[in-house]
Structures are given as structure tokens and as C-alpha cells.
């Protein structure tokens, strides 16, 4: 099962990313848990300085923007 973490405070773009990630999981037809991470210390541990950030299975996939659900689906499928 994949673990997807959405990094950032409770902002509009963070919510958009969380929804896009959930849609991507459904679209990809995979098992994944989408987690919201708001703790600044934890976010810095990933080296993310611009939010929202997206981490898939411990690897930073995106920072400072909201990738589309299609992009996230591709990343989840390994494309």
C-alpha cells in the first residue's frame, strides 16, 4: 500500500492537493493512504520550503504547486 502525504498548513492549495491525491488514488485503482501533515518540523525534515508539498512513499514528488490528479496518477503508477 502506498502512503501519500500532503504537506502544508490548512490552506486552499493544500486542500486542493489533498483532493487531487484522493482522486488520483481512486483513478489509479490502487491501495493508498492519504495523510495530511501540518507539523512544520516534519515538513522541514523532507526539505520542503514551499507548500503545498506532496510525498509519495517517503519521496518528495512536488513542492510549491498543486499537480493535477492525472500527474499524481502517473506517479503512483510509476510513469
Summary of predicted features, one role per range:
Residues 1-25:
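Local sequence-structure signature of Cys/Sec-based thiol-disulfide redox active-site neighborhoods
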Residues 59-79:
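Non-catalytic, surface beta->alpha helical segment in thiol-disulfide oxidoreductase systems
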Residues 47-55:
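Structural micro-motif
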